[in-house]
Every structure is written in structure tokens, then in C-alpha cells.
Amino acid sequence: MRARALAMSNDPIAEEAAIAQLGQGGSAVGAVLAGFFAAAGGYSGVLLSPLTILVAGIGTGGRAFDGRLRQPGLGTKRPRGFLPDEAIPAAARIAVPAAVAAAAVANAYDGAKSLGSLVKHGILRAERAGADGRAEVLGRVRSAGQVAFSEQAFTRPFLRLAGPSEGGLVTPSDFANVTDIDHAATTRHVADSDFLEAPWAEAASTEPLPAELGIGAVVCAVDVRGVFAAVAYFRPSDGLEIDDLALLAPYVAVPTQRGIPRQPPGSPLPAPAPIAVRCNADGVPVEVCAEPGARALNFGSPSRLSISRDPVSREVISHRR
């Protein structure tokens, strides 16, 4: 398929929204975020799961926005911790979502559309699925961005199930202190090519995705300005169901164990980021690559999804393998 701008995903819900956003004159960043929010409305587990956003443009280098889950426990003392033979409650494995914070920062960096205009894709999907609680959460995100997650309408049902009273670590302070989001992309030199990727992206791996993250998905886009963007997110099928919000939180946080140093509160928790942007010898981005469902890109073979752009003709071509 040949054009001047394209978007694609292994998730049909996300792909439809991303293509629609580009068709309305949107940017590559807006397209991939629209796809993410559509998925967040269509599936209960996406909004509270990890997100990686990668952006690269001509003459601007690459940026990575860290929407990985954060370890909870800000503003509290270290708990005593669980003993080796002690049952660990599900609440102790619930982490702090940072996807919306990362999306807001990436969208501000792009500056093309308001975040609310992108979130509307998710609201429509949630309403179509009959998930009224999820539609309400996304409605508040549309109005307030990350601040919506510090409002009582969100924190009260979340903390009721994942707070200290249930053996969890999450506190109100966790939702007000999502930091360290914007990073310069790192460069990996492989087979005479430079690939821009997130600093936390893994090297080639044959290991399966962590079971708690469920299905891996990506959205890729290239716009008429020559900006390349990609997001990697997840659709967990198992986790803590927060019925009042129609959301599912995956079991990713690290429980504190007695006698073992605890995971620092507020620190990002590992998550795969199988997306990269390849540059030519002049440092110009020419291809966005993605390997949905994998822990990392396999740089030795063609990616499952890719969009390439000829810097001279500006023609854009997509590939599915």
C-alpha cells in the first residue's frame, strides 16, 4: 500500500482509530495515541498497563516517553514485608498506571491536537462495549489528563481494592507523582544501520512475554511531515478487576519481602518495548519497525509490522509479515 501517510497495528480497534486520525489531517503521534486510547476503551486492561511511546522526525532526533507501570508506595514507610511462606495478597502486586501521563507529555511534545480529541476514540469504544465506568474514566482523562487519576472518583475505588487495607502498597501520593517520563531515544547500531529505540528496550530475546501482561500490541504511523511514531501496549487477561471503573489492573508490582531491599517506590517496572525507528546513513528516519507480542525486536530479520518512507519521493509503504 503506497501513500504519503500511513498507520497500522496488529489490533484492529487501534488501527481503525489511528487511520481515522491520520485521515483527518492528524500527526503520526496523534494517530498512535488515538489507537492506544481506542484500545483502552475497548479492553478493560489496557489503560492500567504499561505503555512505551517512540517518536522520531527529520532533524529532531528521537524521543521515548515512559508509560511503564510504577512501583507503588510513595509517601509511606517501608512495610515489614512478607515472609517466604506467607501468602501474598493480590493487592500487593498492583502497580501505579503511568500510560496517560506519558501520552499527555508525548502529545504536548507533538503539539498538533489536544489530548481530548484523541481520547474521544476510547470513549466511543467504551460506550460501544457497554463499559460505562471506563467511559467515565476516559471522559475525565479527556478533560483533565493525568489529573483524572488523582481525583477521588478514580482513587477511591482503586485504593479500596489495592490500598494498604487490602495488603497493597498503593497510596494517593502515587497518583500525583508520576515523573521521569521524557527521554532521549538511544541508538542501537546493527547490520550497518542505526535504530532509535527506548532506553529500556531489551536486546534480542526469544523469551515469551511475561504472562501477567497478556497480549502485546503496537501501533505505528508515519505522517506527511516525515515524523515516525510507535506505541507498544498490552492487553492483560488476568489481574485485579476494579468493577466500579470497568478496568483491570495487571499483577506487576513487586511485593515487599522481609529482609530483602524493596523496589524503590515510584521506579518504573520492566516492560517490553519491541519498537524502533531505523535511520539511513545521513541519520534521517526511514522506517518504523515493530514486533507485537515479542519482548524485543529481532534485528536480524524483517519485522512483523513496518512502515518505510523514501526521504526523496516521500512515498510511504507498509509491510505485514
Tell what function each PLM region has:
Residues M1-F195, T256-G259, G266-S267, A273, ...:
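Noncatalytic scaffold domains of N-terminal-nucleophile
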Residues D174, D180-D182, L209-E212, P274-R321:
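C-terminal catalytic domains of large/alpha subunits in multi-subunit enzymes
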